[in-house]
């Protein structure tokens, strides 16, 4: 998570039992100049010290385009004594018409000790009724998973790039989704990071004339930044899902073997270098190379299809940003059940 570059006020301190009354008073005082807007409930849970201020800054930026009721929680589960503080605030932005301020309210909690076990009750009692419930979980998942909490969540947001034990964490996500009867949409910001590069790869194979390459792909090479191996694994899973590769297995930490639809072997190799999360990808089919790489010092992708007997021709496509506000904003604009991601997760279980 990015560091706070300026101090953001948490707002007015309130007694937890008076939060709703104080919110009504806040809006009454601003009547005429402020318009309350909310399309979703967005709860943010973190166990990092100082995250309350950091996430308040993120909410200030996010609500420029995504009106919500934000419930921001910082929890210290290791504290010996109970501690609970609460604040209310509003993130206001001038409307495009320029005459009124459109405001999203935020309720903030700093919890410590045994009272952190009351997370579910605290969240539920401050949801804006009848609006979808998005939960952004910034901590590690841990057992036991609270079935009541997960049964209410409509969209679970997390970043698998931060997981120390991906297999164990994914198993707990499976438990949470089961508690929600499969209704909960999984929103992995690590998957969102791949949006632009997946689009760049997909356009190579849009023309029917390129489909004969599907069963001829022999090797894939992916370059990723330190700490982003899991992002590369998701990219492998996407290729496997779209191209119907099966029998995935890891040959060490950097080499993977899969089987294509024609029962031929496909070898995937990872390499690590400083730079973007996914710095480059090369797919080889016979004498043809399909390549995508980040342009140095810009937010563009260099996209190339090169045949051995032809001159190399480069194109450019947008690369997107590896910025938490941009990633979350992209995620909130999405709809649907993220069915492709669900298939990808099934493909990579043997690779992570």
What function would you assign to each model-found segment?
Residues 1-8, 12, 18-34, 38-41, ...:
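C-terminal structured domains
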Residues 1-136:
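An N-terminal, globular interaction/scaffold subdomain
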Residues 53-56, 119-120, 144-147, 229-235:
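A short acidic (Asp/Glu
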Residues 61-72, 127-133, 151-156, 177-182, ...:
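Structural alpha-beta junctions
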Residues 69-78, 135-139, 160-163, 185, ...:
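A generic structural motif
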Residues 84-97, 154-163, 176-182, 269-276:
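Acidic, Ser/Thr-rich peripheral helices and adjacent loops at domain boundaries
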Residues 108-109, 113-211:
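Conserved, well-structured core segments that form the ligand-binding/active-site neighborhood
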Residues 190-252:
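ATP/pyrophosphate-binding catalytic subdomain of soluble kinases
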